[in-house]
Design a protein with these regions (language model features):
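Short, structured coil segments at secondary-structure junctions
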Residues: 68, 102, 127-128
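Secondary-structure transition/hinge residues
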Residues: 37, 101, 157-160
Length: 187
């Protein structure tokens, strides 16, 4: 049911074509998938972060593909130098989507943190992420500490399944669930 069409096309190591080639392939693929599977959910090709060159690429491409996907997709992988963004790029990605009139759910389908993982995930959710997929322990690059991994697993076990999240202070968020119950997290 879920189709992730292509991967990080702004990186030549994944896609050798031009922007126009990507747009044509993406839109055609999405159209064929929807024709063959009407209930399919198309996930946008993952944007490889929000570095200036990535933003420039997606600012020109998004208006031409926005009618051909259901879920916007951002990746956050730490570079070899360990550089990362505190909200897993979700704040900047949400602003970019808004700037080109794209109003779609945001998924982070490759999440690697380099700081406290729970704090990064909470900030990403507060900034609009609907779903975050951890790249796991076998991903290349810097590894999450055992303590961070334990904290992230505990966070997921305790707070998964929420329907909304809001900041109630600089270090507190409130999760709301389908049954109306609420949980507060201090981080």
């Amino acid at each position: 049911k879920y189709w992730d069409v292509m991967n990080e096309p702004e990186f030549k190591m994944f896609f050798k074509g031009s922007k126009e080639d990507f747009i044509e392939i993406f839109n055609f693929s999405s159209k064929v998938i929807k024709e063959k599977q009407p209930d399919a959910v198309i996930v946008m090709a993952g944007a490889a972060g929000m570095f200036p060159e990535n933003k420039k690429y997606w600012k020109s491409v998004l208006p031409k593909i926005k009618d051909h996907f259901d879920i916007a997709n951002i990746h956050h992988i730490s570079g070899p130098d360990g550089q990362c963004d505190g909200e897993l790029w979700v704040d900047e990605f949400a602003a970019l989507l808004k700037s080109v009139n794209v109003d779609k759910p945001i998924w982070v389908t490759e999440a690697m943190t380099c700081g406290p993982p729970v704090k990064a995930w909470v900030k990403a959710f507060v900034n609009g992420a609907e779903l975050i997929i951890d790249v796991g322990v076998n991903a290349p690059g810097p590894k999450m500490s055992k303590k961070g991994r334990k904290q992230l697993n505990e966070f997921i076990n305790e707070y998964d399944g929420f329907t909304s999240i809001k900041s109630i202070s600089k270090k507190q968020v409130e999760f709301t669930y389908k049954d109306g119950s609420k949980k507060i997290l201090e981080f």
